[in-house]
Swiss-Prot record:
Superkingdom to which the source organism belongs: Bacteria
GO biological process, one term: lipoprotein localization to outer membrane
Entry keyword annotation includes Chaperone: yes
Protein name per the record: Outer-membrane lipoprotein carrier protein
Native source organism of the sequence: Xylella fastidiosa (strain 9a5c)
Family to which the UniProt record says this protein belongs: Belongs to the LolA family.
Summary of the function given for this chain in its UniProt record: Participates in the translocation of lipoproteins from the inner membrane to the outer membrane. Only forms a complex with a lipoprotein if the residue after the N-terminal Cys is not an aspartate (The Asp acts as a targeting signal to indicate that the lipoprotein should stay in the inner membrane).
Subunit structure as annotated in this protein's UniProt entry: Monomer.
Subcellular location: Periplasm
Length: 210
């Protein structure tokens, strides 16, 4: 899978959430993100094709900081790194010694993870619903892009366990499903100044416009 496709679900713009509180997973979402400025945790991810076969597994760490900074680092089965520095998105594959770079744009603004960061845009861009029944022991909030919104997914769902975001599931426009399980969240940690910076080495092959 190309590097850009590999990470298109996880690169997003970050902003503060202060949405209305109501019963159910929407309340869980509000509780999870209230007062959020920085966030760090672990993830494991599976990409599943339309036949139900697991195409890819990975795990690693994710860090974000307001207003629009992201670091998504895969540790296994191979190392890869995504850094959104506020202006550009860098994707680095150390095995290939190759980095791809592009401007942050619509893909980030229309990411399903906007649910974590901007409730006004959430309701403007998506039809939001709460699943009535619990699934896998989690309470679920579901999103579908409204007509006219350019998005790389058909639907997205967030699973909460006691106000903690535990899982995200996405179905892309080809019917492929991505399942991301989160754990070990740390709220508002202090990051090193270079956490959200990427500087390619002299011998790194850079593809894209710097």
């Amino acid at each position: 899978m190309p590097m850009f496709s590999r990470f298109r679900y996880i690169v997003f713009t970050v902003a503060l959430l202060s949405g209305p509180v109501c019963a159910g997973p929407r309340a869980d979402l509000s509780a999870f993100t209230r007062g959020l400025k920085t966030l760090q945790g672990h993830f494991s991810q599976e990409i599943i094709d339309t036949q139900g076969r697991v195409k890819e597994r990975s795990n690693g760490t994710v860090a974000l900081s307001l207003p629009n900074l992201l670091r998504w680092e895969c540790d296994a089965p191979y190392k890869q790194l995504v850094v959104a520095d506020g202006k550009r998105v860098w994707l680095f594959d150390p095995d290939l010694n190759q980095a791809s770079v592009r401007l942050q744009g619509n893909e980030e603004r229309n990411s399903p993870l906007i649910a974590l960061i901007d409730p006004i845009q959430l309701d403007l861009k998506y039809d939001v619903s709460e699943e009535v029944a619990m699934r896998d022991g989690l309470r679920w909030l579901s999103l579908r892009p409204r007509v006219g919104i350019e998005a790389s997914f058909q639907s997205a769902s967030f699973g909460f366990a006691q106000t903690q975001l535990a899982r995200m599931e996405l179905v892309d426009n080809l019917g492929q499903r991505t399942v991301i399980v989160f754990s070990g969240w740390q709220r508002n940690p202090v990051f090193a100044v270079d956490t959200f910076r990427f500087t390619p080495g002299k011998n790194v092959d850079v593809i894209g416009d710097r």
